[in-house]
Regions:
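Proline-centered loop/turn at the N-terminus of a beta-strand
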Residues: 1, 99, 167-169
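Active-site-proximal region of nucleotide-activated glycan assembly enzymes
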Residues: 1-57, 61
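Generic beta-strand/beta-sheet core signal
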Residues: 5, 22-23, 74, 103, ...
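Short, conserved active-site loop motifs that form the nucleotide-linked donor/cofactor pocket
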Residues: 18, 39, 126-127, 193-194
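Conserved catalytic-core segment of nucleotide-activated headgroup transferases in glycan assembly
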Residues: 44-137, 141-143
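Acidic donor-binding loop of glycosyltransferase active sites
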Residues: 141-154
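Catalytic binding pocket for nucleotide-activated donors in carbohydrate/polymer assembly enzymes
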Residues: 151-209
Length: 209
């Protein structure tokens, strides 16, 4: 008996995998025929997060002590699509005093992103952080963020849970399959359904409003 859970959020497409654990925000009832596996629906959410043993209580958002509204995404650079960059660039244009913090260690991707943001005229508003030395340094960076932006169509999971644990709100956009609905499921089950956008225009609107 083989059951698929975290790590590969889709059908394996082969007969040797028997079950896939999901929830009804990720795989709709009328989509079960698209999966080789039988779907095990968990009540509420398919994911679990035990929390972090780190100080997370602070009284105000960074923008309350600054003229700058700070957006952030610590998702793996491989999840940042060109479409995502275009939407983020539009947001940076619409919010006058704003900046976007990105963090990873993939130099090649950073070069590509810089070229893309430069083309959109917002590179000066994007801050690239190197990979953190340790987990505590990584998680404390959330204290510098007013609002986290989820990637699409491949949404975040760990980074979304981390942000919410650190009391930082997250905007996500629901998509067309398991991978692109993870952010939606986490937010809905955190009683934050208003932070889920149905399309790019709504995503932008929710951030800039």
């Amino acid at each position: 008996l083989q059951i698929s859970w975290l790590g590969y959020n889709n059908t394996i497409g082969l007969n040797y995998s028997d079950y896939l654990i999901a929830d009804k925000n990720l795989i709709f009832e009328n989509e079960k025929n698209l999966y080789k596996e039988k779907i095990i629906y968990l009540d509420g959410i398919w994911n679990s997060h035990s929390g972090l043993n780190i100080e997370r209580k602070y009284n105000q958002l960074p923008s309350q002590n600054s003229d700058t509204f700070t957006l952030g995404s610590f998702n793996n650079y491989s999840k940042i699509s060109n479409e995502t960059i275009l939407v983020w660039s539009e947001i940076l244009k619409k919010i006058k005093n704003s900046q976007l913090i990105l963090k990873s260690s993939v130099i090649y991707s950073e070069i590509h992103f810089k070229e893309f943001f430069e083309k959109e005229g917002v590179l000066k508003k994007v801050v690239f952080k190197n990979r953190s030395k340790n987990f505590e340094d990584h998680i404390n960076l959330y204290k510098d963020i007013d609002l986290c932006l989820d990637t699409f169509p491949y949404t975040g999971v760990t980074t979304t849970c981390e942000a919410l644990w650190m009391n930082v709100p997250v905007i996500s956009m629901e998509g067309f399959n398991f991978n692109s609905r993870c952010g939606k499921s986490i937010l809905i089950n955190s009683d934050l359904k208003d932070m889920v956008a149905k399309n790019k225009d709504e995503y932008i609107s929710k951030v800039v409003s």
